[in-house]
Amino acid sequence: MPRSPRLPAFEPHTRTWYVSAEDAPPTAVSAPPFEGEFVLDAPSRREMAEDFGHIVHRMPAAVLRPASAEDIVRLVRFANAHGIQVSMRGQAHSPFGQAQVEGGVVIDSRSLHRIHAISTQGAVVDAGVRWSELLRATLAHELTPPVLTGFLELSVGGTLCVGGVGGATYRYGFQADNVLALEVVTGQGERIECSATEHPELFHSVLGGLGQFALITRATLRLQAAPTTSRTYHLTYSDSQRWIEALRLAAEDERFDSLKGKVVPGPRGTLSYLLIASKDFTPPQSPNDPEVLRGLNPDASVAPVIANESYFDWMNQLAPAVARLEKSGAWSQPHPWFDVFLPASQTRTFVDEALASLPLEDIAQAFVLLYPVKRERLGCAFIEVPTEQRLFLFDILRTAAPTPAALQRMMGDNQRLHERALGLGGKKYAIAAIPFTPADWREYFGPDWSLFEQRKARFDPRHILTPGQGIFA
């Protein structure tokens, strides 16, 4: 490629970027022209070397803020020609460097933030759109995505790569299971529109594919009629067995529109177990509370807490807690999150053992959550889950003190708990801060590993995409 003094340049032998070709040696080649920004400055690169976890720090050589999917096509083709690794970063909510790339180029998808269309046929949105932005926009049309994560300030592209779990997953699957079509850029730099009927192999590989086959630039998402109001229910249990049985019963008959469990410290060093659910409606209709709560048998000593709030406020329920964490500084501390899918038959055993092994102060400052999941609702080819039909996603979302010893202890906990979960038939959820070697990934995929390798060879043969997952050596 001819060199232009107005473009950054890359020297392939020393793997060095230069701000312009005028500063580069004769062997350097100019980067392609971009509509957006391609920057090499240290502050931009340092930002891309961080994520919500504050555990892994990989410094990229450059950052692309694309103006369009064509910018990503140009970058990926250039990267293929010169062996440069590339990753796409959304809201950087990954806890373990999954979207980072040492010495490569990070694509900052926040510049791709347009909502193109909203109708009963679906929402067409860029990958960098946040779910909070999308929900506000769809509610103006009395529509909503079927599944929303508890924290809405995540990017659409980011959650579709890993699945995306929320309180309605037990009814509708992952967020990635509610996608109608995608626009992607493969690891070879091909811009392709795909769906269940058009390039289905690519479509089903990318959803939940951990960024290994293509980068999502736009998605068409399923929408459904939205209510105006959510009636919320908080039921308290003093033992884990009745709590898990109640979650299983409520999930089986799908009486709630969202459903999860939460563990909180109780009196005198005990633990309390909450069933947190909602029933959505639009007045003058309203839920029948006795019928909704039938058979759930919470503690008689603690009255259920029942309240009405707007549907948006309920879906955005974590916003106040996040604001407090940001104000206290805890948001910028390390977050060694633990997330694992468990077979329902082993969930109580694992949860009890895990919680008994952790200091009470860890549980007190964490979000400890349990989501029921129905296997038949899940369709992502490469999100591995236990073989039982009834599952739970168990999350221990901790914040570590900003000291090496505290972080090392919690990361050790994660590895120990993961080994125990594997022994009970569990599977890691890929967002977790659990170190994995390529051999660990092969074990994770099991019989699907050969297909995963084949798809990688087809769509990203030079292995330039998303190395931060650590799947390939």
Identify the meaning behind each predicted range.
Residues 6-10, 161, 180-349, 356, ...:
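C-terminal substrate-binding/cap subdomain adjacent to the FAD-binding core in PCMH-type
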Residues 345-401:
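C-terminal structural cap/anchor segments
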Residues 127, 348, 392, 400-412, ...:
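Extended C-terminal subregions enriched in glycine
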Residues 2-3, 14-16, 269-271, 315-328, ...:
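Short glycine/threonine-rich loop-to-helix capping motif typified by GTGT followed
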Residues 18, 43, 52-149, 162-168:
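Glycine-rich N-terminal segment of FAD-binding domains in flavoprotein oxidoreductases
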Residues 28-48:
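Conserved oxyanion/phosphate-binding beta-strand-loop segments in alpha/beta enzyme cores
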Residues 323-325, 336, 422-473:
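Activity-critical C-terminal alpha-helical subdomain
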Residues 2-25, 37, 42, 452-473:
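Intrinsic disorder at enzyme termini
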